[in-house]
A protein has these predicted regions:
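Helix-terminus/linker motif at the lipid-water interface of multi-pass membrane proteins
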Residues: 26, 30-48, 118-125, 181-188, ...
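Transmembrane alpha-helix boundary and packing residues in multipass membrane permease domains
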Residues: 21, 25, 37, 74, ...
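Short alpha-helical transmembrane segments in multi-pass integral membrane proteins
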Residues: 1-18, 76-141, 185-241, 297-364, ...
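Residue-level signal for short hydrophobic patches within transmembrane helices
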Residues: 7, 11-30, 34, 57, ...
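Small-residue hotspots at the loop-to-helix junctions and early N-terminal turns
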Residues: 43-56, 131, 135, 194, ...
Length: 449
């Protein structure tokens, strides 16, 4: 069902919206976990390192696609908050048209150049072919990944965070079955794990769209809604492109980090891969909060309810504190246990490198949480430039940290790169929101009663 986030308790609305999103994010991690666990246990440590070494490149490309899709969802929330249902239907149709165009533009060059990307990142020779086999399949399925994210973004834009979860649960179960089929039975190697993922995502997307058009009359498009108009395309892309570039800029920084890790060999790559999975699990409340705040701020901006935006952001700050504390506890006290999920018979060396990373980054989870709060809120408010520039600052900080710390501190210096990037990116986001808030307060106080 739809949810109007422009009325009622802001804290309750944000939390209730966030719960299904959190579960969805966890199942999204479950996709990746299943791939990693089955690859590590049935194909070995080298195959695990191969899949892990593709993570940054995948984030670069799929992150761009995801950012575009999330931008479409923001415009949906604006139209829904303003109760302009004619525009809402056109935005739904336009989202589908632009999804097909963007996915076609992304798929062809990435499939063709995947091996070259891996070579540029200094992927070890012993895992290069396995990594390329995996990532080629993932890139070939970009349209399926985009369609799921667009369908979820549309539904979340109208306040429905439950429906995407239901189809994702089904798809996650299917992903497990397909992983075992392609890897254990068919013996398709690392490519089998990729086939399982994109097929499961594609089925989830198709089912989600079928249900969406049947269940929600306000989203049910007609032939008349499907057209490319300059204002509509500009509105959609003016939000979507900065969000997409922000993902990609962040991914470039992560690629620099992964490239630095690759220099230390496949054992360290496997350790870093497993530790990154733990980190992703521990911090899932943070992107969840960000998704909720983008929709909440977008709907209330469309309705012109600025006081509710201010109140929701105050509540969001305290949620950040709780999310950071919970994430740090998971990494510090449960890190070794979760690492063992991803590596068969992990050595002391694997545990040592993985925990060094987790213990280092967990102390900086509050700045990370605040990035998600302020970046997504600003994007929901239509302020896409500074969030994108904060990604550039994040990239620069990560690069400088690696350049300065890798030689004197070795792997530990690499571990400090993420915290440096989070602190550097968070400060301008917070300042920009404060400036935006004060501007709206002045405009409100100077307007006639």
């Amino acid at each position: 069902m739809t949810k109007d986030m422009t009325t009622g308790s802001s804290l309750k609305i944000i939390l209730l919206f966030s719960i299904p999103v959190l579960l969805g994010n966890l199942f999204q991690q479950f996709y990746n976990m299943v791939d990693t666990i089955i690859v590590g246990r049935y194909l070995g440590e080298d195959a695990l390192a191969a899949v892990g070494s593709t993570g940054c490149i995948m984030f670069l490309v799929l992150g761009f696609a995801t950012g575009i899709a999330q931008g479409f969802g923001v415009m949906i929330s604006h139209a829904f908050g303003a109760k302009d249902f004619r525009l809402l239907k056109h935005y739904v149709a336009l989202s589908l048209i632009l999804t097909v165009i963007v996915s076609a533009i992304l798929t062809i060059p990435t499939v063709a150049a995947s091996r070259l990307f891996l070579v540029w990142m200094h992927t070890p020779d012993n895992i290069l072919s396995m990594a390329d086999a995996y990532i080629k399949v993932i890139f070939a399925g970009i349209i399926l990944t985009m369609l799921y994210n667009v369908s979820a973004g549309i539904l979340r834009g109208i306040g429905d965070s439950k429906t995407p979860l239901y189809f994702l649960i089904f798809s996650s179960i299917l992903n497990v079955v397909l992983d075992l089929l392609f890897i254990v039975v068919v013996k398709a190697g690392t490519a089998g794990a990729a086939y399982a993922t994109i097929i499961a995502q594609g089925i989830s997307a198709i089912l989600c769209f079928i249900h969406m058009f049947r269940q929600f009359e306000i989203l049910r498009t007609t032939k008349a809604d499907y057209y490319l108009d300059r204002p509509g395309v500009i509105n959609m892309l003016s939000i979507g492109i900065p969000m997409a570039l922000n993902y990609s800029i962040t991914a470039i920084g992560t690629m620099i980090l992964q490239s630095a890790v690759n220099v230390f060999g496949s054992s360290v790559v496997a350790s870093f891969t497993a530790a990154s999975k733990v980190n992703n699990i521990a911090t899932q409340t943070m992107p969840t909060l960000g998704t909720a705040m983008a929709t909440y701020c977008g709907q209330n901006l469309g309705a012109g309810k600025y006081d509710r935006i201010f109140d929701g952001m105050r509540k969001g700050f305290f949620i950040c504190i709780a999310a950071a504390a919970i994430g740090a506890a998971i990494c510090i006290f449960g890190g070794e246990f979760i690492v063992s999920w991803f590596v068969s018979n992990p050595s002391d060396e694997i545990f040592s490198y993985a925990m060094m990373y987790l213990k280092t980054v967990s102390w900086f989870f509050l700045p990370l949480a605040m990035i998600f709060l302020y970046r997504n809120a600003l994007q929901g408010l239509g302020e896409g430039l500074v969030p994108m520039l904060s990604g550039v600052i994040e990239l620069v900080c990560r690069f400088v940290a690696i350049a300065l710390l890798q030689k004197p501190l070795g792997y530990h210096g690499i571990c400090l790169a993420d915290p440096a990037a989070w602190v550097g990116a968070g400060i301008p986001l917070m300042i920009t929101y404060i400036i935006w808030k004060n501007k709206k307060i002045r405009q409100h106080s100077s307007s006639p009663a």
